[in-house]
Amino acid sequence: RQMCIRDSSADETKGEMDGYVVVLHTNDVHGAISGYAKVAALKKAYEAEGAYVLLMDAGDFCQGDPTVSVSQGKTAVELMNMAGYDVTTLGNHEFDYGYDNLVNLSKEAKFPIVAANVLYQGKVAFNSNQIFTTPSGVKIGVFGLETPETATKAHPAKIKGVTILGGKSMFDCAQAQVDSLKADGCDYIICLGHLGIDKESIGNRSTDLLNVVDGIDVFIDGHSHSTMKDIAEVTDKDGKVNGTLLTSTGTKLASVGVVTISPKGKVTAMSAP
């Protein structure tokens, strides 16, 4: 007698969010390391529902809490590895312990650091961008931008040899990234930026950039510790600036940002406590 064994593996992966892309994002964690367990659990929960999940950070992760500061960011990177981060950009505080330390951290990290406008001796210091492809073939291009304010906020000795493009040079760099990622066949383009929306950052803010750079689907912001409520004050009723969804999620993991891309291409942003 033949036994009929039903293959349930395909059914088990089918969840309510099958075909969805979920981007979980954090920014300005500043050493609030107890929250990383929550982030990891959220990633697993969405994956259990069948979503393709990317976990990103928009900078300032390796300074703040003494545990993280004493280790010069190493503790943060270890915990981010465990939480399953897929890509990050740099914040100005990543340079607090110097460029060489940051290079060492990038080697410890199991995730790429993307920062298209950060140059070392004239060449891109880390990675400009990273492309992720979902099982169904959707391509998501992610590029990073660091605040040019790092040049004045960091001690000169810590950033010797480092150039951070700002203003028009940064805008041109961003547009070149968009054009390159589109040429590579990306269906969605995300900018992971540590720019912020503060008045004192005028000329280098995410909003300034989005008014001149076209083709970014989602801009995940940091630097100004802005919540979604703060962001709503600088966007249109759809949460967009010049057609780009702008989002940010405060500081110290008080909440985690959730960007959802539906199978039909609808992109929405919210935050999870």
Language-model features: where?
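Acidic, metal/ion-coordinating pockets
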Residues: 11-273
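Short, small-residue-biased leader/transition segments that mark boundaries at the very start
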Residues: 1-5
